[in-house]
C-alpha cells in the first residue's frame, strides 16, 4: 500500500489511468478560514480554506474528483470526507461525476462535544461518502472487536482549556488522562 500526501490534483495528474484501487479524499471543508495545526505555537501544518465563492470551491473539487475517477480501476472506490458546511454540494458533485447509482454508503463519523453554545446545537459528526467507479467494485469486509469503554472513557476524562481556549483533556505529570 502507498499513501500519497500533497496537492492531490498535482499527484493525480502523474498517475496512470485505471491504476488505483482506493482513494480517500479529505478536502478543505469550505470553512473560509486558514487552518493551522500547531504544537506549542510552532505551526506544523497550515493551509488556506478560503474561497471567493461556493462556485470556486465546487470547481476546485470537481476537477480533482474527475481526476480521481480517471485513475480509479473499474473495481475501485472513493471515500470523500466532509462536514455540514458543504456536504450537500459535495454529494451532488459526486452524483454528477460518478453517477447517483454508484453511491454505496454514507459513513457518519460521530464524536462527542460538550455543548455550552448559546446559539444552538454544536456539530457532532462529519460525513464520509463512499462511491464506486462501477457496480463491480471490490469490498473486503474486516471484522474487529469494538472497545466497550471508548465512549465512556471520552465522557469520564476531565477537560480544561489550553492557551488558545481549546478544550483539551487533563493529564497528570506522567501524561496519563485524569478521570
Regions found by a protein language model. Give the residues of each.
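Core catalytic lobe of class I
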Residues: 1-179
Amino acid at each position: 500500500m502507498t499513501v500519497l500526501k500533497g496537492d492531490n490534483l498535482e499527484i493525480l495528474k502523474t498517475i496512470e489511468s485505471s491504476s488505483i484501487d482506493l482513494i480517500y479524499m479529505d478536502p478543505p471543508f469550505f470553512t473560509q478560514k486558514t487552518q493551522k495545526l500547531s504544537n506549542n505555537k510552532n505551526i506544523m501544518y497550515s493551509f488556506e480554506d478560503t474561497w471567493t465563492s461556493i462556485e470556486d470551491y465546487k470547481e476546485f473539487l470537481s476537477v480533482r474528483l474527475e481526476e480521481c475517477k480517471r485513475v480509479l480501476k473499474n473495481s475501485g472506490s472513493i471515500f470523500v470526507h466532509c462536514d455540514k458546511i458543504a456536504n450537500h454540494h459535495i454529494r451532488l458533485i459526486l452524483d454528477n461525476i460518478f453517477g447517483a447509482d454508484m453511491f454505496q454508503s454514507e459513513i457518519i463519523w460521530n464524536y462527542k462535544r460538550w455543548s455550552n453554545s448559546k446559539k444552538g446545537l454544536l456539530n457532532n459528526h462529519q460525513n464520509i461518502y463512499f462511491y464506486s467507479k462501477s457496480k463491480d467494485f471490490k469490498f473486503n469486509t474486516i471484522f474487529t472487536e469494538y472497545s466497550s469503554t471508548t465512549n465512556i472513557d471520552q465522557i469520564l476524562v476531565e477537560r480544561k482549556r489550553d492557551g488558545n481556549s481549546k478544550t483539551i483533556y487533563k493529564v497528570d505529570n506522567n501524561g496519563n488522562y485524569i478521570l
